[in-house]
A protein has these predicted regions:
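A solvent-exposed, acidic/Ser-Thr-rich amphipathic alpha-helical stretch
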Residues: 17-68
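A beta-strand edge to alpha-helix "cap/lid" segment located at domain peripheries
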Residues: 47-129
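Generic detector of well-ordered alpha-helical segments enriched in charged/polar residues
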Residues: 6-9, 18-19, 43-47, 121-124
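Short acidic-aromatic low-complexity motifs
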Residues: 1-25
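Generic detector of low-complexity/intrinsically disordered segments
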Residues: 10, 14, 30-32, 94, ...
Length: 129
């Protein structure tokens, strides 16, 4: 789990796909606040990620918890695009087969631009950031 988590972070931060991260026939089910998309290959999953997050970013916080068939991966990420800093928080349910990711179900908060982050910071004090 830890090795796959590290490989996944590398992919999320750089867009580079470490060897052995995804099965060629990996299934993606991505849910965003107002949309849902799916992909049925590593090539399509990678294209979907790069379309939504084309540049490098940083995973600023993450956690992985094992399940009987894989693990749950929670993370926060930040990146710069369109002249501003963006933020998203996501939860992934990952199914692993033969040491590689076979299925990835993603729930995303959506991409928060600078204005949304400022609005949230002014309105809400998080107990556990």
């Amino acid at each position: 789990m830890h090795d796959l988590s590290e490989k996944l972070i590398r992919f999320l931060e750089t867009g580079d796909v470490p060897e052995g991260l995804f099965r060629p026939d990996v299934f993606l089910d991505l849910t965003m606040p107002t949309w849902r998309v799916q992909a049925a290959s590593a090539e399509d999953l990678i294209a979907e990620r790069k379309q939504g997050h084309p540049g490098p970013g940083r995973v600023t916080r993450w956690r992985a918890d094992p399940t009987p068939s894989g693990f749950v991966f929670e993370f926060e990420e930040r990146w710069n695009s369109e002249g501003q800093s963006w933020y998203a928080r996501e939860m992934l349910r990952i199914e692993v087969t033969d040491g590689t990711i076979a299925e990835l179900t993603v729930y995303c908060t959506g991409d928060w631009d600078h204005a949304r982050q400022a609005e949230h910071a002014a309105a809400v004090t998080l107990i556990r950031p």
